[in-house]
Amino acid sequence: MCIRDRFDIDPLILVSIVGIETNYGKRYSEYTVFNSLYTQIVSLPKRSSWATKELYHLLLYTKEQNISPFLLEGSYAGAFGYGQFIPSSFNKLSIDYNGDNKKDPYNWEDVLGSIAYYLTENGYPENNHNFTFRSPIWRSIRTYNRSDKYANTVIDFRNEISKRIFLSY
């Protein structure tokens, strides 16, 4: 089943998010996730509690998947995969979209399905194409990265892609 049919999410929003987050999978592994989170725990007192929770979720995920927590690579903040999920969000909101019994942060079907599910669970409305500032779609995108600038950039990128696709026909 097509992701758009299951979740009623504008596919260009998904394309925009993975483009911004990892340049479509080309840039997702600059740091070891374990080290990123541990460094925040010991070096950044304001982020220590948050990073401790995320490290716990990272360890849950790596144990479940039977992989070393020291091999998973991601961002300086501890996000990983093509969608750059933080461990707690990945554990809670990722899905096995392709049906192989694995929630894989490096499988495009699972990644796009997981982002769509995440946005839906965070208020992305059905049958809605209002991409304006502070609309329900904008708000759901903002939960993915708690920044007005991020949500605006995703929507601007989506609009630019849409314009270029339309102009090419």
Protein language model regions, located:
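Short capping/connector residues at structural and topological boundaries
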Residues: 29, 38-42, 95
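Short, conserved phosphate-binding/catalytic loop or strand-edge motifs used
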Residues: 20, 31-38
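Short, solvent-exposed loop/turn and secondary-structure capping segments
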Residues: 27-32, 73
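Non-catalytic cell-wall polysaccharide-engagement segments
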Residues: 44-169
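Short alpha-helical patches at coil-to-helix transitions and adjacent helical residues
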Residues: 11-14, 30-31, 112, 151
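Alpha-helix N-cap/helix-initiation motif
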Residues: 6-7, 104
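Short, functionally critical alpha-helical segments immediately adjacent to catalytic or ligand/cofactor-binding
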Residues: 8-25, 58-63, 115
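Short, small-residue-biased leader/transition segments that mark boundaries at the very start
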Residues: 1-2
